Amino acid sequence: MPKPLIIFKDFSFQYYSQQTPTLNQINLTIYEGQKVLIVGKNGSGKSTFLKCINGLIPHSYQGKITGTAIIKDKVLTQTNIFDLSLDVGTIMQDTDNQFVGLTVAEDIAFALENDDLPQSEIYQKVNMWAQDLGLQSFLDYKPQELSEGHKQLASMAGVLIYNPSILLFDESLSNLDPVSRAKMTALIKTIHQKYHSTILVIEHYLEDILDDSFDRVIVFEDEKIIYDNSPQKLILENILTKQGIQEPTYISALKKVGINLGSLPYLLNLPALQSLDFVQYFSNQLTNLKKCAISQNDPTQLLPFFPKQFAPFCPILQLQNISYHYESKQPNILNDISLDLFPGKMISIVGKNGSGKSTLAKVICGFSNPQTGTILLNNQDLTHLSLQQRSEKIGFVMQNPHHMISQKTVFEEVALGLLGKQLSLTEIKTKVHAILKTCNLDCFVNRPISALSFGQKKRLTIASILVMQPQILILDEPTIGQDLKHHTQIMTFLQKLNNKGITIIIITHDMSLMLNYTQRTLVLEQGKIIANTTPLKIFTDMSLMQKTSLNPISLIVLINKLPFTSEQKNVLLTQMLAFLKEDCCYGK
């Protein structure tokens, strides 16, 4: 029988800065070699739970503990964080907190150097993990020079290289491009099978991770565990839907066409579902579905729920021959980019990690100055504007909220940008409270920012930019770390802004977001724009998707197996997305 490895008995934890517990009466045993998925709404206690396993609580985050937690025979409150780290490896949500080396290679090698391994062995292992994670060409880079996605991979390599018996992944797949995410999901499976590691994974985005390889799924709600059972039962009992957690799109589609999920022996094994018998049954069910969302004469037209379009008389933003590199010895991050963006559009920018997406946004906003090229806003050259002047016209919400936050409380952070605008305190309070309510943060108005979850901090940074009412809003992965409720609130709010004429640019790895909310997609590859078209056309260009590390959502994977023509598949996909959106099964 497997050995109990992680034991929580009547365990509660309350941060000193909060009035109520973040974990309340947790009773749980995780056995050696189990692979566990942990889900729940923002602020439900998931990340705090992992911090109690790796020792960050109580050693780095103080608070009141009652009950008992035992990690690999070590009592949590009686064991120092170093001893726990020998058994527990954590890949954090915020990778910048993990780097200790001056270069990526040094950072990956850090744990092995502490163990005084021979240099030849260290070199061999560093190169092996760098190759497995696609980091070979970045070993000499400073960690701070990497894209957020490559930072995530580097931090993973630094943990995986010393093979701890317990591995914790705290939203660690969220910054990865779709192909890298799929590779990392496969790597986690391989590590679990090869080393029999005990693995705990926290994820909000279940599209390509929820499958039958997990032994258990644990659901947190209001600081308690409300579900601890198999992933199959999770779907059959509609636990995700009840909790407002987005289920994989193909699951929503199966429900929509009336398929009895309990009759499917391989419900969470998508490749097995693609058998001929099932495909034929799915096809018949779709044929019987009488609704029609679009004209079949134009299968690639925009989905009907897109916002009102504004007449593009002239571009609002023009990029002319923009090139940029960080240091002269390094190749260009952006290569001779020229682009016209029109007012009132919601645009997505996609591409593999390191393709130049975030750098392009920083150049537009003035955080980085291009070596060549011109940027025009409403035909005005932005070169001579100060960073403050440009920020009043173009708002930028960074991927990592910790790179933006500078104040102690929620109110102070949102009010900061308004202080120089000659507004009365009453006017400032009115604007701050209104935007906090929109972002579902009004109940935290006087709370210290340090007490917020990562997802709540993300919404806070969005609020701090939106309160300035910019003409163009650029968001780098705005929904990372958000549960379905807050994901939908953010995107619905962005749609309302877009309907008012604000041009919105979203950098994302979320293919569902791209397909459901944006009217146009730019695809970057090695610092160049190689596609500028509608999201649906991106998904029908398989060579483009393979070249740029874009993976189709699970619904598309399923539809591609149907015995239809390409045009029929495009019509079907558009219909299904409209149906799911309409019935609130998906994206709401």
UniProtKB/Swiss-Prot annotation:
SUPFAM superfamilies documented for this protein: P-loop containing nucleoside triphosphate hydrolases (SSF52540)
GO MF annotation, one: ATP binding
Domain ABC transporter: 6-247, 317-551
Keywords annotated in UniProt: ATP-binding, Cell membrane, Membrane, Nucleotide-binding, Repeat, Translocase, Transport
EC number: 7.-.-.-
Cellular-component GO terms for this entry: ATP-binding cassette (ABC) transporter complex
Presence of the UniProt keyword Translocase in the record: yes
Compartments reported by the entry: Cell membrane
Gene3D superfamilies in alphabetical order: P-loop containing nucleotide triphosphate hydrolases (3.40.50.300)
Residues reported in the UniProt entry to bind ATP 1: G40, K41, N42, G43, S44, G45, K46, S47
Residues noted as binding ATP 2 in the record, renumbered to the chain: G351, K352, N353, G354, S355, G356, K357, S358
UniProt entry tagged with the keyword Nucleotide-binding: yes
Membrane topology: Peripheral membrane protein
Function: Probably part of an ABC transporter complex. Responsible for energy coupling to the transport system.
Family: Belongs to the ABC transporter superfamily.
Record NCBIfam families: PRK13648.1 (NF010167)
Protein name in the entry: Putative ABC transporter ATP-binding protein PAM_020
Organism this protein belongs to: Onion yellows phytoplasma (strain OY-M)
Taxonomic placement: Bacteria, Bacillati, Mycoplasmatota, Mollicutes, Acholeplasmatales
